[in-house]
Amino acid sequence: MLRYLLKTLLQMNLFADSLAGDISNSSELLLGFNSSLAALNHTLLPPGDPSLNGSRVGPEDAMPRIVEQPPDLLVSRGEPATLPCRAEGRPRPNIEWYKNGARVATVREDPRAHRLLLPSGALFFPRIVHGRRARPDEGVYTCVARNYLGAAASRNASLEVAVLRDDFRQSPGNVVVAVGEPAVLECVPPRGHPEPSVSWRKDGARLKEEEGRITIRGGKLMMSHTLKSDAGMYVCVASNMAGERESAAAEVMVLERPSFLRRPVNQVVLADAPVTFLCEVKGDPPPRLRWRKEDGELPTGRYEIRSDHSLWIGHVSAEDEGTYTCVAENSVGRAEASGSLSVHVPPQLVTQPQDQMAAPGESVAFQCETKGNPPPAIFWQKEGSQVLLFPSQSLQPTGRFSVSPRGQLNITAVQRGDAGYYVCQAVSVAGSILAKALLEIKGASLDGLPPVILQGPANQTLVLGSSVWLPCRVTGNPQPSVRWKKDGQWLQGDDLQFKTMANGTLYIANVQEMDMGFYSCVAKSSTGEATWSGWLKMREDWGVSPDPPTEPSSPPGAPSQPVVTEITKNSITLTWKPNPQTGAAVTSYVIEAFSPAAGNTWRTVADGVQLETHTVSGLQPNTIYLFLVRAVGAWGLSEPSPVSEPVRTQDSSPSRPVEDPWRGQQGLAEVAVRLQEPIVLGPRTLQVSWTVDGPVQLVQGFRVSWRVAGPEGGSWTMLDLQSPSQQSTVLRGLPPGTQIQIKVQAQGQEGLGAESLSVTRSIPEEAPSGPPQGVAVALGGDGNSSITVSWEPPLPSQQNGVITEYQIWCLGNESRFHLNRSAAGWARSAMLRGLVPGLLYRTLVAAATSAGVGVPSAPVLVQLPSPPDLEPGLEVGAGLAVRLARVLREPAFLAGSGAACGALLLGLCAALYWRRKQRKELSHYTASFAYTPAVSFPHSEGLSGASSRPPMGLGPAPYSWLADSWPHPSRSPSAQEPRGSCCPSNPDPDDRYYNEAGISLYLAQTARGTAAPGEGPVYSTIDPAGEELQTFHGGFPQHPSGDLGPWSQYAPPEWSQGDSGAKGGKVKLLGKPVQMPSLNWPEALPPPPPSCELSCLEGPEEELEGSSEPEEWCPPMPERSHLTEPSSSGGCLVTPSRRETPSPTPSYGQQSTATLTPSPPDPPQPPTDMPHLHQMPRRVPLGPSSPLSVSQPMLGIREARPAGLGAGPAASPHLSPSPAPSTASSAPGRTWQGNGEMTPPLQGPRARFRKKPKALPYRRENSPGDLPPPPLPPPEEEASWALELRAAGSMSSLERERSGERKAVQAVPLAAQRVLHPDEEAWLPYSRPSFLSRGQGTSTCSTAGSNSSRGSSSSRGSRGPGRSRSRSQSRSQSQRPGQKRREEPR
């Protein structure tokens, strides 16, 4: 409290002194205050406080001293700031801060204060507070450090807050400037402290200064000369410590004055030609363009300003000359560009020279006045001469020719040699024009004709090292001289390899490859010259020389003198005759012409002429011509015909200028056509291409000529093309398999140009299009079975190539008599052997090339004569035997025969197997017979409409075996029957003793004709010998039932039916019915065991398929047995048929049963089912059975059960002492393994039975059987009664067949059979009937019935007392795998 009071007083004192202003220095004020308050401190402070106890000053204490002075600060609003201050002293001084002389409150003194005093003495501002009205943090701050010795004050430090306003005092504005002009953007930043700096941004990027072009001064942006790239959005940026401010964006638009990308240029054009002035400009904004003509207007109706701003003027004339200007304007400027137009007018004749006739020694003058722009130059020239006559030219040495400045030609002292055409030519840059006039000398003759070459060089193909003679015989007046050129170059006379003879022939010795080329013979005289050319080529096929022609080896004779038949102003028609006396045949003609006005040489005006008349076209009007004709043959050209009489063409209009007819020909002669390699496009088609060099403006078309190359040199076929730009064509229809020689000439208005070098190309071969000629057949000398066929090749035009072979066919009336043979291409005959005498054959021959066989010839019929000692049929038969022997030796026949034999054997084996199987099944059926009581089952499902019996093989039969067997209807009552067995002895282990499928199918077959269930017979018999049993049609379910376990012998028919029943065909019984002995009931079956014992032996029932309930029951015994009167034989009772006929009727049992002795009627008791008895296999006694007693009720049950069948304690007293059977079950088609599974047999015909037959009179989906179980099979060893029958010779045929089948089956491998022990099943012999007691007949089921017959699961009644226990026991017992059944003899 005292300290707070002192501090308060100190602050009040300081504040009062500052207001009074007496003391200027705060440090002095504080010292005075300290000294004045020393006594007060001494009295008020505690005596132990050394800081204010002046009487206890230590020697090391010191007054405060400011070590670190606070600096001036410039901070931003809202930002933190720190004023440092550090002091030294002893004791450590306290730091205080004053603002503008007032004490600064910190958080230590006032929690509401926003300033902090740091331990180092610095004053910290977490956030500078600054507003327009309140500025609490801005001011002058002083740091004071004090201890008891005194106080020290720091320098005054100012704290200022930086400020920058938002509004620019002047924002930049938009600027529009042209390219190259300066631009200025002004900007005045907003107010702020400190004063903000200014920078610029262009399109969001900082703008940098460019030396000399872009500068920033005082906030202004200045560009000395703008560029197109300077256009954009500019922003002025003002910045200081308080931040940055951006102005509104200002756009700088840099426009572009019009500038020319393409300027119009000066042009010079011909009159009537179009002209185009180009003008392309650029600018921003796009400039507008317009055209104007200096000192005039644009030609109305003849100009057009197109979309690209170019100026087009059509059909210009001299008046259109001038300067044309393109003007481009936009908002920032204007530009102009000009081009001049000069129109040249070709020279034109003002005065036309006229033809004149003068006598020798006279003077003549030819006028030739012209005009044009620019003015043309005029000169004269005589045709055929190289001398040019110009105006003002000095006179010739003769002094007879001169040209005036106006273009007039003067000739003085005309001579005979001055005759001819004189040409006036006017030439300027705009073109040229010529006019000619004819000077005729009176009395002139035709002695001055140019030389004529009688025989010139021909085209030749040579081999290296040979010698060649190139002839050149000439004639003329005066006699011409002969010189030779090779490839356009003169041959030197000193060359030793080339030698020119006196008659002009050129001799070349030891020809080399360098000597090949184009040779020309030139005959020259004072009257003119003539040229003849030919080429030499090297032969490629050295060893093959072409066959010489068969014609005379000399050229054709000279034709007759041509005669003029028709004259026009442009054409002359000539006619001549050939010379048939000498030389080779004429293939064509060549026509040459000479005109004194056209030059001093003969020119070819037509070639390849086929007829003896021709019209020469393309001639000049009013011109004299002379003609001669040559014939062309295989050996070259003939000598020329006599020269025709001079003929003048008709005159044309005199006002029309005459043009030079031969000047164009001279220009065409300079046009070089180079033929390229032809391309084969397809059959008979070539593409020909060429290039042209020289004055192409004279070319108006081309002539393409081709022919078949060869020594004969066929005629040329010509194709004229009228387009000068076309330099390729397609030749079609060329003969295949030949060499085609091709050449090309340029065509002009004046005629044809020089020929190109010919090119040869091969055409692909084709099959001959024609048959061989002259096919003939002659009998051969090689016996009577051969002929000789001869022929000639097809026509040359139909061969289509080189014949490589001939195909000969000799066709008989059947294909087996056909013969064919091939012969070489050079052959003309062939012999065919092996013909059958007496047969008519057709013989054909066809030629073949590499492309295929051609058209065959017409058939030629031939028939060989038969020998006189044999008839025609025998001869043919002998031929057939030979051919049959050949066929039998063919591998294909042998293979086919083997395959057929194999298939036949397989079919035979299958038939035998099927037959044997049928015998087995029928024998089973024959051996079985049934007496079954007609009992209706209320719960039966899926049964036939003719029966209400349960499905066979499923449930135990509710009745005991009947006492005696049913005698066969055909048996005598007095016949002696052995007792103890009803089946044949020695049964096969694989055999079944009942026919499930047969009886079921028979029931299905006869079900339609039977009565209702209630009307059926009580007992039925099965007659194996009856006719009805011989036709069993199978009606099997399409899907077999599931696995029935080891009791598949009671399975539905489809599981046991063999191949014999697959198709539902008839089954033929081969055996005879067996007479069965009668047995007594007590001898055959023991009494049943008690129900308590049977309940312990129940087996699994769930495996039985087709049942709707999981349990079985035994139906009650009938109240009375339907017995018939006993037969006279004793012991056998005959059941009367409903219709009183002995024929068999539908039976509902599959195995033999005896008649049941009637018992007194008792109320029906609930039956006790014994399913385990169904699973007990039967035992077979080793010897003949003795009569059985009732004390053995469990006689069919195995003594040693498998793992799946547990024997209860009550079952052992009733087991039979006979040996146990083997493990394998006797069910056909399946084998019972010891683990309780069924394995399919090796041969399985089931898959074939799944297809439903067409006729299904009877079908059960879920009924495994309708009949009682089969009888027990006999033992392996024959019973005593069977031995007695065998000894008595009474064995039936069926027994004998079965005995044979058993022997055959023994050879079958064990894997395909059911391996059975001879003692596998127990055979229960029938004995005389005995009667059961009432309790035995009503309370229990029959033992044999339990073992061999099971009631339908769908017709079960009430359940016995021990059913659930027995079913669970059967499940547990059947699930013990791996335990095999073993049978050990007891």
Curated annotation (Swiss-Prot):
It is found in: Membrane. It comes from the Eukaryota. GO terms for molecular function: cell-cell adhesion mediator activity. Residues 1099-1112 have a biased composition (Acidic residues). GO terms for cellular component: axon; membrane; plasma membrane. Residues 541-563, 639-662, 965-989, 1028-1310, 1327-1386 are annotated as: Disordered. Its main location: membrane. Changing T604A: Decreases binding to NELL2. Residues 21-891 are extracellular. Residues 1067-1083, 1178-1191, 1202-1229, 1345-1361 have a biased composition (Low complexity). Residues 1294-1304 have a biased composition (Basic and acidic residues). The chain crosses the membrane at residues 892-912. Changing F594A: Abolishes binding to NELL2. Residues 1333-1344 have a biased composition (Polar residues). The keyword Cell inner membrane does not apply. Changing R630A: Abolishes binding to NELL2. GO terms for biological process: axon guidance; axon midline choice point recognition; chemotaxis; commissural neuron axon guidance; dendrite self-avoidance; homophilic cell adhesion via plasma membrane adhesion molecules; neuron migration; positive regulation of axon guidance. Residues 546-559, 1158-1169 have a biased composition (Pro residues). Residues 1-20 form the signal peptide. Changing E639A: Does not affect binding to NELL2. Monomer. Interacts (via Fibronectin type-III 1 domain) with NELL2 (via the EGF domains) with a 3:3 stoichiometry; this interaction promotes oligomerization of ROBO3 resulting in the repulsion of commissural axons in the midline. Receptor involved in axon guidance during development. Acts as a multifunctional regulator of pathfinding that simultaneously mediates NELL2 repulsion, inhibits SLIT repulsion, and facilitates Netrin-1/NTN1 attraction. In spinal cord development plays a role in guiding commissural axons probably by preventing premature sensitivity to Slit proteins thus inhibiting Slit signaling through ROBO1/ROBO2. Binding OF NELL2 to the receptor ROBO3 promotes oligomerization of ROBO3, resulting in the repulsion of commissural axons in the midline. Belongs to the immunoglobulin superfamily. ROBO family. It is linked to Gaze palsy, familial horizontal, with progressive scoliosis, 1: An autosomal recessive neurologic disorder characterized by eye movement abnormalities apparent from birth, childhood-onset progressive scoliosis, distinctive brainstem malformation and defective crossing of some brainstem neuronal pathways. This is Roundabout homolog 3. It comes from Homo sapiens (Human).
